[in-house]
Amino acid sequence: MNFEFEREIGFINSQPSLAECLTSFPAVLESFQTSSIKESTVIPPPFEHTIPSLSPCAASQPRPTARNQQNRRNSNTNGIQTHQRAAQQPCPPGQAPATATAAGPMAPEFPWMKEKKSSKKSSKPGSSSGGGAPILPPSSASPSPTASGYASASIESPTDQSQAGLDAGGAGSRRLRTAYTNTQLLELEKEFHFNKYLCRPRRVEIAALLDLTERQVKVWFQNRRMKHKRQTHHRDGSGGGNDSNEPGGFEPLEGADASSPYSSQPLEASGTGESESEQGSSNPSSAAYASDSGDNAQSTAEEGGLLGCPDRQSLSAVSGSSATHLHPLTATNSSDNQAPLQLNRTGPEPSFSEQRDSSIPSATAALPDLTLFATDACLSPSLQSSLDSPVDFSEEDFDLFTSTLCTIDLQHLNF
């Protein structure tokens, strides 16, 4: 019988079973062979014939404690090997109940069995919640557009019952963020530049175009509005940023400001910090007109940079004096020889008041002057009064004035 039992054990070791973990240690194996053959009648015949190595596991009444201690010692030293075997070799369906019923109250759960159960329990919610938030989840990954199948949407409470169950199981792995691609971020930023708030049809359209869900687009716009609000309050509080001399610096401002009919509206919107005062008036026509005026501003700024190089040199000597206000009398009193030439070039519009006959070269020559004297906090009274009063500009003057406003820092103006 002993020889036959050894042959059976060798056969069972060649296939995955629960008994391999119990009989793979030689010291434990020899202790089984003396005691378990006598008491092998405890196991019912079907289990004994199909799985013969269960009889030493379950019927060894006098030696369960020594076996458990040796098994625990060996599993501590060979923990990785035991854990890998337990993970790779699932037990047959009829085997675990037989071990539990036969061993019964005399033997507790083995350590590797506990590890297997806990890893199963934690891997199921972890894998499903991790799979619910891929790096770029397609729109078909969630069961419905309104269900919260995404772990990245971290603002609102889940509306799906299965997701709520997953959150209860794996609460530590839920707060994952969606990684947007550069293309998606660019399109979302463009849309946010023109519309701070999206209606639902537009949100569905953007989600379909960018391969996102409607919930992800909504949450991104909520976060972006909060970021815009923080940026606006920070700029109003500090007021010392010189980084908006180019047209790209006006990205956080409202999309409807550049297309407003009066020139004082962009100044008031940026000066008072009311970031949501004119959000309802942004429509596609005004957005297109704002993009046209932005392109016009960029081209005008480039022309001003080409034409105004000698003018910057001329004004660098007089920038400390009051000639930076573009008054002709104080400029001619200064000892600089190039200052009258400079003021002759900028003569048609000394203070940007209501002059209809201003030409584009004179305006582009005045662009570097504006960027230089905008660093001083004082302005001429005529310019300030003309800014406060809404004036009916022609279309040409309005384009010129909009492009000029896009090149100076509006935070230094006193209202």
Curated annotation (Swiss-Prot):
Instruction: Say which domain of life the source belongs to.
Output: Eukaryota
Is Nucleus among this UniProt entry's keywords?
yes
Q: Where is this motif: Antp-type hexapeptide?
A: 109-114
UniProt entry tagged with the keyword Transcription: yes
> Where is this chain's protein located in or outside the cell?
Nucleus
Q: Where is this region: Disordered?
A: 43-171, 225-360
Q: What is its main location?
A: nucleus
Query: Entry's PROSITE patterns?
Result: ANTENNAPEDIA, HOMEOBOX_1, HOMEOBOX_2
Q: Name one GO molecular function term.
A: DNA-binding transcription factor activity, RNA polymerase II-specific
**Which stretches are labeled DNA-binding?**
173-232
Low complexity bias located where?
96-107, 138-154, 268-288
Keywords, A to Z?
Developmental protein, DNA-binding, Homeobox, Nucleus, Transcription, Transcription regulation
Recorded hits in Pfam families, A to Z, give: Homeodomain (PF00046)
Taken from the UniProt entry, a GO cellular component term is:
nucleus
Matching entries from InterPro entries are given as:
HD, HD_metazoa, Homeobox_Antennapedia_CS, Homeobox_CS, Homeodomain-like_sf
Which SMART domains does the UniProt record give? HOX
Biased-composition ranges, Polar residues, are 75-85, 155-164, 313-345
Q: Give the protein's biological function.
A: Sequence-specific transcription factor which is part of a developmental regulatory system that provides cells with specific positional identities on the anterior-posterior axis.
Which family does the record claim for this protein? Belongs to the Antp homeobox family. Proboscipedia subfamily.
Which named protein is this?
Homeobox protein Hox-B2a
Q: Which organism is it from?
A: Takifugu rubripes (Japanese pufferfish)
Q: What is the lineage of its organism?
A: Eukaryota, Metazoa, Chordata, Craniata, Vertebrata
Q: Which gene encodes it?
A: hoxb2a
